[in-house]
């Protein structure tokens, strides 16, 4: 039996559940075209701010043995650049599945203005609101402030009527899973994306007795294999706590078909790849699809729905 990776997500059908994580291989229109023409099932734009941002000083992204450390600071070309791209692509490829569009304002008001621009546009895809960037100096992660998260979503859904998901930071306590899930269940969210990088880690070059990234005295977001257990826990925690209408996108530590299978088993509907995409380029999607299919066929599964969320307890 041949395994199918076909994935239905918010009334869209994708050939497979794989996509890039926002921030990786999606800064320029060239990179976005490469994603669109790759074996990825879907793709998402770089998190956009109102105006172009250079981000933090370099070095700000370093590959390390089991993953990466980054303190990018949201470099991007500004919302108009990405909105123009996705609108043109919609016209040129009207039958293609929906594009994901990411925004990450520096304040609630900026986020509201960015979302108003999307609401008023002809964009017919899926919007992701990033409430979890850990790498902008002086700007705390909104999603660690539960009251501020609720206030933000109250104001957003007062006017935003298009499909909207939010990107969350990792949580580490059952009480926090419970509190955040209760808040999110009050809103018509399309999905949550768990997780963003684990914020404010430190990697050290022993030879130089130095940190390896320049911003924030070397503190940066950790990605890759280091974060997979935390990512899986967050995917599972929200999958079991959120209304079934709110889907979960799994992000964190996916570099093989086995990693993908684990995320899906925990309940993920789609899968985003960051660190390993940065290392391998878009060819990773073809490899990881084959690996996932091989696992499914060895287990006798013909579709992802046969095992999604079916994690056994002991």
Curated annotation (Swiss-Prot):
One of its GO terms (cellular component) is cytoplasm. Binds 1 FMN per subunit. It catalyses: (S)-dihydroorotate + fumarate = orotate + succinate. Its EC number is 1.3.98.1. Keywords: Cytoplasm, Flavoprotein, FMN, Oxidoreductase, Pyrimidine biosynthesis. Substrate binds at residues 46, 70-74, 130, 196-197. It is found in: Cytoplasm. InterPro entries: Aldolase_TIM, DHO_dehydrogenase, DHOD_1A, Dihydro_DH_chainA_dom2, Dihydroorotate_DH_1, Dihydroorotate_DH_1_2, Dihydroorotate_DH_cat, Dihydroorotate_DH_CS. The keyword Cytoplasm applies. It is an enzyme of class 1 (oxidoreductase). FMN binds at residues 46-47, 130, 167, 195, 224, 252-253, 274-275. The active site is at 132 (nucleophile), 133 (nucleophile). Transmembrane segments: none annotated. GO terms for biological process: 'de novo' pyrimidine nucleobase biosynthetic process; 'de novo' UMP biosynthetic process. Homodimer. This is Dihydroorotate dehydrogenase (fumarate).
